[in-house]
Every structure is written in structure tokens, then in C-alpha cells.
């Protein structure tokens, strides 16, 4: 009885490790994709808002790449 319990726990542990390894080496998760798209949208909005006041595109891009925290 005790050995079957140990083997069951070992199988669960191995399944957990395999799932984590596959998720790291595989495609990005949905949250990572959404986070990247949200960051890209924030950057585009920042550049567009900056260009309304400043004609220099390069300065706006640099300012939006390294935003100053509030």
C-alpha cells in the first residue's frame, strides 16, 4: 500500500515537472501575448500623443521607450 502511494506521488511530481518544462520551451502563453500587445498599444498611444505637441519623432519614440514613473 505504501509503495503504491509513493509511486503515485512520484508520477504526479514527474507530470508536474514535464508540464513546466514543456510550457517554458513551447509557445508563449496567452497572458504573455496579451501583455506584449497591451505594451505595444501603450507605446503607440504614447508616441501619437507626443507627436501632437512635438514634431520630432525620434525624441517621442525615445521618451516612450523609457517612460518616467509617476
Curated annotation (Swiss-Prot):
GO molecular function, one term: toxin activity
Domain of life: Eukaryota
Signal peptide: 1-26
Propeptide position ranges: 27-42
Record keywords: Disulfide bond, Ion channel impairing toxin, Neurotoxin, Potassium channel impairing toxin, Secreted, Signal, Toxin, Voltage-gated potassium channel impairing toxin
Disulfide bonds: 46-64, 50-60
Any one of the GO CC terms: extracellular region
Location(s), subcellular: Secreted
Tissue spec: Expressed by the venom gland.
Function: Voltage-independently blocks potassium currents on hKv1.1/KCNA1 (IC(50)=217 uM), and hKv1.4/KCNA4 (IC(50)=71 uM) (expressed in CHO cells).
Family: Belongs to the short scorpion toxin superfamily. Potassium channel inhibitor kappa-KTx family. Kappa-KTx 2 subfamily.
Additional record remark: Negative results: has no effect on other potassium channels, on sodium channels, on bacterial growth and on smooth muscle tissue (a known assay to identify possible bradykinin-potentiating peptides).
Record's protein name: Potassium channel toxin kappa-KTx 2.5
Amino acid at each position: 500500500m505504501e509503495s503504491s502511494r509513493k509511486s503515485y506521488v512520484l508520477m504526479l511530481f514527474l507530470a508536474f515537472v514535464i508540464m513546466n518544462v514543456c510550457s517554458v520551451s513551447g509557445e508563449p502563453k496567452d497572458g504573455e501575448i496579451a501583455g506584449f500587445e497591451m505594451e505595444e498599444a501603450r507605446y503607440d498611444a504614447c508616441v501619437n500623443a507626443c507627436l501632437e505637441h512635438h514634431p520630432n519623432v525620434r525624441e517621442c519614440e525615445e521618451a516612450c521607450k523609457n517612460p518616467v514613473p509617476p
